[in-house]
Amino acid sequence: MGTNVQVDSASAECTQTMSGALMLIESLKKEKVEMIFGYPGGAVLPIYDKLYNSGLVHILPRHEQGAIHAAEGYARVSGKPGVVIATSGPGATNLVTGLADAMIDSLPLVVFTGQVATSVIGSDAFQEADILGITMPVTKHSYQVRQPEDLPRIIKEAFHIATTGRPGPVLIDIPKDVATIEGEFSYDHEMNLPGYQPTTEPNYLQIRKLVEAVSSAKKPVILAGAGVLHGKASEELKNYAEQQQIPVAHTLLGLGGFPADHPLFLGMAGMHGTYTANMALHECDLLISIGARFDDRVTGNLKHFARNAKIAHIDIDPAEIGKIMKTQIPVVGDSKIVLQELIKQDGKQSDSSEWKKQLAEWKEEYPLWYVDNEEEGFKPQKLIEYIHQFTKGEAIVATDVGQHQMWSAQFYPFQKADKWVTSGGLGTMGFGLPAAIGAQLAEKDATVVAVVGDGGFQMTLQELDVIRELNLPVKVVILNNACLGMVRQWQEIFYEERYSESKFASQPDFVKLSEAYGIKGIRISSEAEAKEKLEEALTSREPVVIDVRVASEEKVFPMVAPGKGLHEMVGVKP
């Protein structure tokens, strides 16, 4: 078939014979894919040839890492799988960080990589890399296609695997000759995946055990993770917490799963969590974890974590239950379905009046804080508060990793699900800007703010060109402290102020750099300038880069030092 010949899904089923590349395009249409993030190259040219005039929207980043992080942002906000294409060799290996990020944060991606022709696989051919071997630890599943007829079945399976159970990335490696050879197309394959049957319905006996545990607990607390968001269970979590009057703490990735202004909300738990959330986890007698995996950044020293508590762990991934914490009440199932079942049980509320009194006292005595002294420079915490104020709390906030990420989590109270896009488990610098692009493409009318540091921003700043090309109204707010802030903080506290390679001796002019990309750039150095310029920038429908000079020696508090328990926080008060 020639380059410009169009074959829609109906005619494809009728004619049956087509190239592997066209099978890929038609399969994506069957899966109702609307958007692809990709970067062409030699091994995927047959695919890009069939993509031409296919009707599918393709986003061309300026680096493959930008493609996969944008796909992550798209998946996180839309709930749909992000689709990525990259060529063989370096194109494929440039995706590894994004795959690892999506794997640990449970984001559904379907990633297509080109490969050298089957006849030269294993010969160190030009741009050959064993991408299956390289990515096996960081993908939920992976395939290498050897016959074009297998492509529709494999793609159908890949979307199913990526989006069911615990979501994750699936990689499909396509040799160039497989993309050009013709074969019979059919998308009517029955799904047959022996050994892959995710459990969504909970065991009734375990539900009863949990109901009984709640009725007898004096100090219950819920730890809600990203599994609540992946399961679209925010409303059920709120209803269950209110029904049983159980306070709720969140992991970093779980923010937005429970309204931050709710009386039962304790805040974020963990290394930079609130005093109340951390002490609640330390002192509770029943801990109900929902869609959280007891990451070390949440638990602190395990010897001290929830030391007197019975642990109930609700998770769709049975491999997570008992992996870190000994669990007395394991519940395998989808968070939404499990919570619906718990609500139906309408168990007896525990007598936790003294517990609630204690939590209220902690909230009153130990709020999040910072010293608002502008002689030390414009405080980044105040900047985040202004962003919240000027966006009315309705923005989608995408961040990089570091101090600015923690301040965003602490001082931008999220009321709704799917407004918070960040790299949690892997902690990937350079994530924020491309993820914001993906989020904006998923929600075209939303206000999307990329909050980044001056370090991480420079890892993927070339994606500004995508923002300009598509005229996306992304707002990029750079917390510019002229250093790697979190690294500098650790060096100050734990390494006797030996600031080894954490301060930037020189930097580009970010305003001029933005203007070179055709994007408006503004600079803010004080609270007065923030009041004057920030609201207009954040409420416009044009892309803007905002370079904010913030206090360089500001630290993120509270903080749990490595090896310490959650109750051993430092910096809980000025």
From Swiss-Prot:
Pathway this chain belongs to: Amino-acid biosynthesis; L-isoleucine biosynthesis; L-isoleucine from 2-oxobutanoate: step 1/4; Amino-acid biosynthesis; L-valine biosynthesis; L-valine from pyruvate: step 1/4
Binding-site residues for Mg(2+), renumbered to this chain: D454, N481
Self-association state and partner proteins as the record states: Dimer of large and small chains.
Residues engaged in binding thiamine diphosphate: E64
Residue ranges that the Swiss-Prot or TrEMBL entry lists as coiled coil: none
Gene3D superfamilies assigned to the protein according to its UniProt record, in alphabetical order: 3.40.50.970, TPP-binding domain
UniProt-listed Pfam families: TPP_enzyme_C (PF02775), TPP_enzyme_M (PF00205), TPP_enzyme_N (PF02776)
GO terms for cellular component: acetolactate synthase complex
GO terms for biological process, alphabetical: isoleucine biosynthetic process; L-valine biosynthetic process
Cofactor note: Binds 1 Mg(2+) ion per subunit.
The entry's keywords: Amino-acid biosynthesis, Branched-chain amino acid biosynthesis, FAD, Flavoprotein, Magnesium, Metal-binding, Thiamine pyrophosphate, Transferase
Catalytic activity: 2 pyruvate + H(+) = (2S)-2-acetolactate + CO2
Required co-factors: Mg(2+); thiamine diphosphate
Record-listed E.C. numbers: 2.2.1.6
Protein name: Acetolactate synthase large subunit
GO molecular function: acetolactate synthase activity; flavin adenine dinucleotide binding; magnesium ion binding; thiamine pyrophosphate binding
InterPro entries: Acetolactate_synth_lsu, AHAS_TPP, DHS-like_NAD/FAD-binding_dom, THDP-binding, Thiamin_PyroP_enz_cen_dom, Thiamin_PyroP_enz_TPP-bd_dom, TPP_enz, TPP_enzyme_TPP-bd
Chain sites annotated for binding FAD: 166, 272-293, 315-334
